[in-house]
Each structure stands twice: as structure tokens, then as C-alpha cells.
Amino acid sequence: MKKQKSFPMSAYEDLLGKITAPTITVENWEGILAFCDMINNDFEGSKTGIKSLRKRLNNRDPHVVLLAISVLDSCWANCEERFRKEVSSAQFINELKALCTSSQRQVAEKMRLTVQKWVDTECKTEQSLSLIVTLHKNLVADGYSFVVDDPKSKTKAIDAKFANDPNYVGSAQEEEAIAKAIAASLADAEKQEKAKKSTSTMYPSAKASSPAVQTNSNIPEKNVRALYDFEAAESNELSFVAGDIITITDESNPHWWTGRIGTQQGLFPSSFVTNQLDDLKSKETDSSQKAPEVVASINEAILVRCLQVLHECDPTGERQDPEDLAQLEAASYAQGNLIDAHLASIDRQSNSLAQIDVAIRDVLALYDDAIQKGGFQHQSQGMYQQPMQQYNYQQPPNRAYYPPTGPVQQQQPQQYPPQHYPAPGAQPQYACPPNSVPQPQQQQQQWPAPSSQPQQY
């Protein structure tokens, strides 16, 4: 069939909306086949059809999703191979997995049955549909069923199977009646057990044990040692403390024995005593002798020696360990708390030194900043004060005036040495460094001293 021009996305959505409307109760096969023809007659029909189907498959209404699955199955069977490749693409395979594992039972079952049908038909001949086969295998491995789960058919099959079994219960009423009967029987059994417990005691009475004592009088007595303290709660019980030696007169009952301490006799729990009389004391004395008290102190030599001895030990056990290994290990373990405390104090000192270092750096930074600011102000003041100091002008000294006594003689005006002044706005040229400018008193002009004789005018 010759391909026509591509249809718009809206045409697919309109047609798909009609054949998957929520009001439809039965599949509209005429519309479904028209949708398949639209995909086959379109250049991009496979991709556009998949996009429109994806929207309907993700609808919230399960009825719409069931109709969309029917449309998808029909397109799989009636469209070309390109459509099946789009369905088996990595992007759409996640949609299929979500539908197969959906919480809606009918949707999940229908999608799994559709995948099962695809695997049994087209996927066997077309190698490009391998992702569908992989999805089917993963679902089977996860325990999903590919059979319709119909509760009614299950109950019918079970009823037919156990129709001749008298113990089979087919109705809810029979099951409820049986449950009530079982509960009543359990209640009666509990009452009987409570009555038995009230008439009997937790341990054999003294009267019951007296024949045993008489019959077992020929059995040799033995001594046991108390492990824990026991205080008698009844008159026929025997009280003792840990370490007491008890003579056993009857041990026919595995839980309560009869014994005596001196003139006192009675029952006591067998788990409170032991047959080992001197083993514990000997072990305590041996351990006290083998493990002398270790004075805890940090000693690097002991740690180094312990490591050397451990390296020399034989891991196979063929050669015995050195004799001083136990003492070295005990001394090394005793230093653990002291070493931890010493390391903690070192950490505290390191932290305090780090804080002091930061404070010193801050102070030095402030000092450098102050020095830089002070040097700039000093240079700026020298630039404006030194020209005034260099050119310090003074008025000529006042001279006394005497009236002329004779003829006035013309006198040439006194010639002063020429002075060169800087032009306005020009910066003065310094002949010496700024910090070595002489004082203004040294740069004053020397005026000629007045003559001692009055001048004649």
C-alpha cells in the first residue's frame, strides 16, 4: 500500500478517544481497524500512534486502559513490523512493565496475557523483539502469573476436587461453626489445666519425698557447693548462701533436690548448686598468681616489646608462645585509657595553639594596615609642607631714619641678589630627599648688616 502524507497528532487522538471512551462497554472493532489503517497509511504512523496510545494507557480510569490494551494488541497484529519495533523499544517497554505490575488486577492480568501471546507468536520469528521476551522472563522470575485469576472458577474447581472429602468445608457458615466448636474445646482444655495446677505444687512435697529418702537410704551421699544465695519461701525448703557446702540426700527429682546443712534439711533448686567444690577456688588462686596487678603507666618500651613478641609468635600453634606474652599484653592494655587521655590533652593544646596563631595573624594584619595608612599620610603632608618651608620669605629689618645734616647726595639703590620664584601652578623641584629638607631658619635670606654710621642724604 502506498504511503500518504502524515496525519496530525490530533487526528490520532480524536479517533482513539472515540474508540476508548469511558462510556463504551464493548470494543469498537470498526474504529480499531480504522486506527490501524491510519497508522499503516502514515509516514510516521508508528511513532505517532504509540504516542497517542501511551496517553490512553496512563489514564486513571481502568476501563479506558483495558480498551487501550485491546487497541494496542490489534495494532500489534495488523500493523507493519515498524510498529512492533516501536512497542519493543526501550522507552515503551517501561510502560508495558508498569501495566503488567499494575495494582489494578484486571489491567495487569490483561496486559500479561497480551505479552504472553506476543511471545508465543511474533517474538519467536522476529529477533528485533528481544526486549519483549526479556520482559516476559523477568515477570516470570518475579513470580507473576500469566493465567487469568478468576475466583469463581477456582472455588468451583476446589469444590469439585474435595466433593467426597468429609473434612472439607465448602461454605462460610460451616467454617464459622467449626471455628466456634474449636474455640469452645480450647476453653475447656484451659480450665482443666488450671484445675490441675491448683491441686498440685511446683515441687514435690516433703511427704512424697520421705519414701524416696527411705528407699534411697542406701545410696551414698555427696556434697555440692552453692553458687547463689537461696532464701526459703516454704517451711520444707532449705536456705543457704553462695559458697555453702550442702550434703545431698535425694536427687530423684531433676529440678528440686533434698539436702542438709548441719541439722537443717529441706528442698532447694538443683540449678543453684554445682558438683565442683575446689575447682573455682583453685582457678581463682591460679589467676591471681598468674596475673599480678599491673600499675598503669605509659611506657613505650613495653609496647614495642609486645609488638616484637607478637611478631615472633607461631600462628600455627606448633611452637609455644613466649612466657612473658601475657604480662606484656596486660601491661599494654592497661595503657589504653592513659594514652587516650594523653592524646585528648594534646588535641586540646593543639587547638589552643591554633587559636593563638590565628589571633597573632589577625594582630599582625592590623599592624601592617596601620603602618601602611600612617606612611601614606606622612608622605602627603610632606608634599604640601616642604615647598612652604623652602620658600620662607622674611621682611627686611627696620632701619633708623636720621635727618640729613649736609647736602643730599644721590646714592645708588642697593642691589639685591636676584631670586628665582617658581611659576604659579608648577611643582617645586627638590634638590634633596623629602625627609632631609633643612629647617626654615637655615634657608632665610641674609640681609646686610646696617652700617654704624648714619647715612648722609
Swiss-Prot record:
Residues 198-216 have a biased composition (Polar residues). Coiled coil: none annotated. PROSITE patterns: SH3, UIM, VHS. Residues 173-192 form the UIM domain. It is found in: Cell projection, Cilium; Endosome. This is Signal transducing adapter molecule 1. It comes from the Eukaryota. Widely expressed, including the pharyngeal intestinal valve, several head neurons, and phasmids in both males and hermaphrodites throughout development. In males, also expressed in the gonad and sensory neurons in the tail. Expressed in the male-specific ciliate CEM, ray B-type and hook HOB sensory neurons. Residues 394-414, 422-457 have a biased composition (Low complexity). CDD domains: GAT_STAM (cd21388), VHS_STAM (cd03568). Isoform a, but not isoform b, interacts (via C-terminus) with lov-1 (via C-terminus). Binds, sorts and targets the polycystin complex (lov-1 and pkd-2) for lysosomal degradation, acting on early endosomes located at the ciliary base. Functions in the germline together with the ephrin receptor (vab-1) signaling pathway to negatively regulate MAPK activation. May have a role as a positive regulator of meiotic maturation in oocytes, acting independently of vab-1. The keyword Protein transport applies. Residues 219-278 form the SH3 domain. GO terms for cellular component: cilium; early endosome; endosome; ESCRT-0 complex. Belongs to the STAM family. Residues 19-147 form the VHS domain. PANTHER family: JAK PATHWAY SIGNAL TRANSDUCTION ADAPTOR MOLECULE. Residues 366-383 form the ITAM domain. Pfam families: SH3_1, VHS. Residues 196-216, 394-457 are annotated as: Disordered. One of its GO terms (biological process) is endosome to lysosome transport. Signal peptide: none annotated. GO terms for molecular function: phosphatidylinositol binding; ubiquitin binding. Keywords: Cell projection, Cilium, Developmental protein, Endosome, Protein transport, SH3 domain, Transport.
